[in-house]
Amino acid sequence: MLGSYQVAMSIFGVMMTFVSSGIPVVLSRNVSYYSAKNDKKSIGSLVSSGLIITGLICIIVSGIILLFPNLLSIIFTSNASTEMIYILLPALIFSSIYEVLRGALWGRKKFFIISVTEFIEQVLRIILLFILFNTTFINISATNKTALSLSLACVISAIIVIIIYFNTKGNLSNPKYEFKNLLKESSPITAVRTASSIVSSIIAIIIPLRLQTFGYTANEALSEFGIIMGMTFPLLMIPSTLISSLAVTIIPSISEQSNNIDSGNLKDKSILKSKINFSIKSSLLFSSLLISTFIALGSPICKFIFGNEKSGIYLSYASIIMIPLGLSQITSSILNAIGLEMKSLKNYIISSAILILSIFFLPKYFGTYALIIGYFLMSLSSAIMNISMLSKRKLINLSFMKTILILVLINVASATLGIFIHNLLNINLILDIIVSTIFTLGSNILLMLCFNIANIKIIIFNRKKKFA
């Protein structure tokens, strides 16, 4: 049953990506730009257009599923997964409404409201799940109850966001002014995010098969793949959460200066450049913060969390991905914020091709580590191409390359200290991790402050003032 749930949720995730992943990003960007000009008519037109576009896509997707149920039978081997998709259709429809209005609120910098609504949605899911699992008159399977709780939570959350949107002076107006532009600008972003889901599926197929070709058994190949993707990579993604939060708060202020840099929509280039450089330096800080800790303590950390030391070995090697991954993430967001989504799509396609080629050819020489090398090359190539796009438009100060070099040296020094402390200690695993992390992470932060990598006070206390 759990397998059926995972399969159904994977397909639902792809559907959600296809329906509404690009619209909220472009909508928030343009709402931010028009808000700075106090152009309420264009904002209303954008929101109306977003609701119509996502609504039409939802109708088409839902119609295909309802009119051609045999399509799901081809995709799924279990009827349980098919039933879940039917139950999740209301979640698809109401989530699309939620995402559009959330994008509009994001563009208007209503960050606290967005956080509250997302928190409410999660609380609703827990409460509804508890009620459904303790209700006897609803005679459906546990997985279907889980799907139903998600659908109900999405419906209620959408209603709450609708009320909040109009109570905060949100408006709707004739969509004809922005419909075509919104559809055109959001398509590349939707393509990137849908392709990302597809690429993940391709990787899940290619890596085990290639490992089997070079001596692994089927079980060994799947096990190694599961260790890297299920244990190692989630820890590598910790800085990505911080960078995503940075993007949420700073991207609207970037879009205020220009929602399409190549068309000449630009208020103040010096301010725009300042914000872009701040974003990049902050992402470097977040990305490099845990590298030395993961290099020195990957094995004990993963042994404690997962009971698997091998995932920790992978983590130590894979930590080199974190800086190019963070750069790729923030620069992609910046390109989308200033109307260069087609450039971002092109860069993504090229970097994804590098990843797929790497995991196809490199397992012969590096085994499972080919996946780590592939993601490193993908992130590095994406970051270089994105930075090149910004550099050509004179929107970036390449002095951050010096910052990267200093951060690498700092992490080497901190990791060396961490390894020394870890080898010196002969104590309980948890205490070992705590003490070694204090020395490793502490020395990392101390060296960053000594080399003036980041002014912590400015980042924490003055960010609102700097980007108001």
Where are these regions (language model features)?
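Helix-loop junctions and terminal segments of transmembrane helices
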Residues: S21-A36, L236-K267, K273-I280
